[in-house]
């Protein structure tokens, strides 16, 4: 499942960040920000138009991600982790 598929209020554990290509700067930056395997993540809010952007939280830090960026983050829903 992808982070972009989670409903508002849902919690999951990050499985991996998908690279679109070799040396993908967006995926690299997501990992630098803490989107790494085993880290819990929660969808706090979704934008009004098409759900873009997503407001997600890792630890005490919140990030606004475009759906395309969130789709690179593969997660395991909390109830399955």
Question: PLM features: what roles do these ranges have?
Answer:
Residues 13-20:
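Acidic, low-complexity mobile loops and tails
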Residues 17, 33, 44-46:
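Residue-level recognition of beta-strand microenvironments
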Residues 14, 40-43:
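Conserved hydrophobic positions within beta-strands
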Residues 3, 10-12, 48-81:
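C-terminal structural segments of small proteins and small subunits
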Residues 23-29:
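Short alpha-helix capping/helix-loop boundary micro-motifs
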Residues 1, 28, 41-42, 51:
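Short beta-strand-initiation
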């Amino acid at each position: 499942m992808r982070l972009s598929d989670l409903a508002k209020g849902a919690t999951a554990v990050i499985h991996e960040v998908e690279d679109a290509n070799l040396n993908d700067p967006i995926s690299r930056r997501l990992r630098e920000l803490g989107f790494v395997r085993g880290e819990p993540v929660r969808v706090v809010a979704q934008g009004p138009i098409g759900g873009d952007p997503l407001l997600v939280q890792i630890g005490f830090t919140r990030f606004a991600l475009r759906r395309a960026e969130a789709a690179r983050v593969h997660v395991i829903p909390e109830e399955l982790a």
